[in-house]
Amino acid sequence: MMMRRLLPRFHLPVLLALLIIGASWSAPSLARPQPGHFVASPQQQAMVDDLERRTFEWFWQTADPKTGLVPDSAPGHSFSSIAAVGFGLTAYGVGVERGYITREQAVQRTLATLRFFHDAAQNDSEDDATGYHGFYYHFLDMETGHRAGRYVELSSVDTTLLLGGVLFAESFYERDTPQEQQIRQLADEIYRAVDWPWMQPRAPLISMGWTPGGRFIPADWKGYDEGMLVYVLALGSPTHPIKDGAWQAWCATYQATWGTFEGQTFLNFAPLFGHQYSQTWIDFRGIRDAWSRQHDLDYFQNSRRAALSQRAYAIANPQHWTGYGANVWGLTASNGPGGLIVKGAHGERTFYGYTARGAGLDDITDDGTIAPTAAGGSIAFAPEIVVPALAEMKRRYGGAIYNKYGFVDAFNPSFHTKTELRTGRLVPGLGWVDSVQLGIDQGPIVLMIENWRSDFVWKVMRRNPYIRKGLQRAGFTGGWLEQPVTPP
């Protein structure tokens, strides 16, 4: 067996901006589960309960209680991911709802987090700032709270994911106590400080980010992907809103990825995280913008079809990866064993490190690496295929991929090459298994499990006036948007 090491991958926003459009795979029509109300068996429900609790504990145990900063990955030494902080702020509410922690514990952790971001240095320094113009750097040093390195961008989407948790906190902690009043005040001020039009050097689109020296990333958020939430929050701002027409500009590129893949017709984005992140906080069931009215398909239904197509792709398994099947599937941005090019029985194969894996009309990036969050974060969309998949992955691979914090980030049963690994380990008889969890992959698991169980996060966010305003300015109508706000 021969191998050669690949150069490191691009940072993910730049990588996604450079994806080549048009790769596709089509297989014969397969029998697929039909939509309907799925009822988990007692054994399945117990498995999901255990996964939710363990995944919550990852956030609770790894965050710095003084600043609220959540590591990008753990265990091990890591910088903080501001997106992971947003998922964590929301997970604390789930912890209260499920009885994992007390409300007072959640209040204290949330206050510490909001105080840190509210008071953090906002300037154009290369090394001594946490953010600028209300946005925050993608990665922060866990000790100083400043930009983790000069390669780190001021990120519009990661700031948005942080704000998802900030706005959740504003709407969840509604009691008339001094501490919960302060949570609401801090959260509101953090959101109001974001200067969305400044991040539009090529308006009406929003740039992916900025670096000191006035350099905006030369790529904008264009549909369809996780950038959806960026536009909703930018449109909903009471202080620095973007102008009308931005949502229409975002939607203008939809047609390039609308089509049929693996028997499902939907708006494609190959990695499943693009279908999950915005819908972790916003309930898109029954609400539609002009595009979804025209196609008679809401975004929740679109994400359901994306999950179904990935399962069908795994069943077809065109690249003959080990382990793929009806209950072992799921491609998204995750860690991996590479980068290496290895020659073996199936010819030359490329294995990546961290990258955006996926399968769709827009792109196929598949090296045999399965990320449990791809299925787990889709549980609210398609529980009848996700719950059996989570159960089977846990049963088949056991403690190698499942530990005190739930599933490890990823595993690859096709990779057995003995080499120096950047992360993870080789398990005899299984293959490569990661040794850490990532905050941005843990978040969709715990939050979407609770949305599937009780609509909890969705119900809280329906009360947020900025979310409602952003959706309405984007042209969404119907469903819960037409109903009065339900008090907690």
Predicted stretch roles:
Residues 26-28:
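N-terminal signal peptide c-region/cleavage motif recognized by signal peptidases
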Residues 32-488:
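Ser/Thr/Asn(+Pro)-rich, low-complexity disordered segments
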Residues 2-15:
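Bacterial N-terminal signal peptides that target proteins for export
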